[in-house]
Amino acid sequence: MDAFETDDLVAAQHRPGEHTYTDFLRRETLSLGMSVWPAGGEDTQRPHTEDEVYVVMAGRGRITVAGEDRSVGAGSVVYVATGVEHRFHSVEEDLQVLVLWAPPYRSRAGASASGEAAGR
């Protein structure tokens, strides 16, 4: 069985004031990661080559997806389709976000390592 505690995932990657991302599960059809954006931090990600589902576990901020903006906090779930512009912003409290990728992150040919690595 693969089982994880999000608190442990966050603690293992914690670097105060920095955005961090860790892949922790990868299968043929999907992958999971934990991303943390610090309060006041900047999200510099670019569109990805995979669909994403963000599940906000803790914190508060805002997200813009394809020009549509909304607030997010613990319990928010946001779907982002392949290739769509999206960005977290106005982070008031460190955002801890579970990220589901389908297919797995960077699994599609031609994925831009330089563009995607910055923001996941």
Give short role names for the model-derived ranges.
Residues 67-82:
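Short acidic-glycine-tyrosine-enriched beta hairpin
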Residues 82-107:
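Ligand-binding loop in jelly-roll beta-barrel domains
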Residues 36-38, 47-63:
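Short, conserved beta-strand element in jelly-roll/cupin
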Residues 27, 53, 60-62, 65-67, 69, 85, ...:
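Structural motif
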